A protein has these predicted regions:
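Beta->alpha loop/short-helix hinge microenvironment recognizer with preference
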Residues: 1-415
């Protein structure tokens, strides 16, 4: 590896560099990266921000995102054996807060789900919580694990009630966490991709399309509230306030929390790819695509964007300060090592008993598997450009690489 002092000298040489900031530095078509590059340091100096503080993971992910595709992220050096020109290829950050890296991360996540998913009817289920509970999860991000646990407990309970007629069946399901609504406000909820039916102990798939809504709603509410009680039990004052809120919620939400689990048309059942893409869409990138930004004025420090209100299906245009916009985005950055996508039941990686049955059913149902696409092949496929091909037509040879000291513990990130 190149030493730090040598790296500074190397970056002064005239080389061909794949530096993303040159591509995204356009106010008419601003990227999230550009907006944070221009205003994040000033955002950190705001009195309200200083008072509340910033989570360490936010500072780390933003720093990684800002350095993505630049020499600050590290690089590899290549030399053309024919013309002897030097080429530098900058590393990407692989941050969950990076729009461009997130696209690839989401694509890989979708491919992983497609690889394990059976070609059987699935249902999209959305588990929501009472608005009054949202602040608890905002104060303590680790409580978000409760939403996964509660959704899993609810689904397992619903399918256990089917044992009388169908014997024992195990569904396959994938849970993903979304912490936002379309207006970018804090709204944690669970999206679930659930098989309509399950695998028996003999390895057969039995279909059942009926789902008891009442059990789903009331069961999920009970699981969430009980699990939150356990999590808050060590704080007597907080626990007392929460118990009072729980009593009020049971009175107000007699039918349980809202759970959305519509039937999918038969023609859509045959291809769940679009559903998978939607469920994992924002699990590895910022919660808003840059394409929704309609105007950005760096001098006035204003930004305009739009979203579609799901209740009215009408477009809503928003204009606000860049600082307010930044604040909305960073609160959705998950903690380090927090898994936004989790696998359960027949799809659980630790379910060794059903693994062989799932593999057999997948081959029997002609389920197509997907392979991870590497950086080089991805550029060739999408842009028709080979990053290792010199302009003279010869392939370059690898010389050396450089990773900044601060990122060397995360060397796996630069795959």
């Amino acid at each position: 590896m190149i030493k730090d002092n040598w790296a500074k000298a190397i970056t002064k040489f005239p080389t061909k560099s794949f530096d993303k900031m040159h591509i995204n530095n356009n106010p008419k078509h601003p990227s999230i990266q550009l907006i944070f590059h221009n205003h994040f340091n000033d955002f950190l100096e705001l009195p309200d921000v200083k008072k509340v503080g910033i989570r360490p993971v936010v500072l780390k992910e933003v720093e990684k995102m800002l350095s993505c595709g630049t020499l600050d992220a590290g690089f590899e050096i290549y030399e053309c054996p024919h013309c002897h020109n030097m080429h530098i290829i900058c590393y990407t950050c692989k941050s969950r807060f990076c729009s461009s890296c997130g696209v690839n991360r989401t694509r890989e996540q979708s491919a992983k789900i497609r690889k394990i998913a059976l070609q059987v009817p699935h249902r999209h289920v959305v588990f929501t919580i009472d608005k009054r509970l949202r602040l608890y999860f905002r104060k303590d991000y680790h409580l978000l694990n409760i939403l996964f646990l509660s959704a899993s407990q609810t689904i397992d309970y619903v399918f256990s009630k089917m044992k009388g007629k169908l014997n024992s069946i195990t569904p396959g399901y994938v849970l993903t966490l979304h912490t936002f609504g379309r207006d970018l406000k804090w709204n944690p909820h669970i999206h679930c991709l659930l098989t309509e039916g399950g695998i028996t102990d003999l390895g057969n798939f039995i279909r059942t399309s009926y789902i008891n809504y009442s059990t789903l709603r009331k069961g999920f509410m009970k699981c969430v509230l009980n699990n939150m009680k356990l999590a808050l039990a060590d704080n007597p004052m907080e626990f007392k306030k929460f118990k009072e809120l729980v009593n009020q919620i049971y009175k107000d939400d007699e039918n349980g929390f809202y759970v959305f689990a519509p039937d999918i048309e038969e023609k859509k059942q045959k291809d769940i790819d679009s559903l998978i893409d939607y469920v994992v869409r924002y699990t590895g990138r910022p919660v808003m695509a840059a394409s929704r930004i309609t105007n950005y004025n760096p001098n006035k420090k204003e930004i305009s964007y739009y979203y579609e209100d799901h209740t009215t299906s009408q477009r809503v245009d928003v204009t606000e300060s860049v600082y307010e916009f930044i604040g909305k985005l960073i609160k959705h950055i998950p903690e380090e090592q927090f898994k936004m996508v989790r696998y359960y039941g027949a799809y659980a990686t630790c379910n060794h008993k059903l693994k062989k049955f799932v593999r057999f059913l997948r081959s029997k149902l002609n389920r197509i598997t997907f392979q991870k696409i590497g950086y080089r092949r991805q550029l060739i496929t999408i842009f028709g450009t080979d990053p290792l091909l010199c302009s003279c037509g010869h392939f370059m040879n690898y010389i050396d690489n450089y990773i900044p000291q601060k990122w060397r513990n995360d060397i796996y990130e630069f795959a």
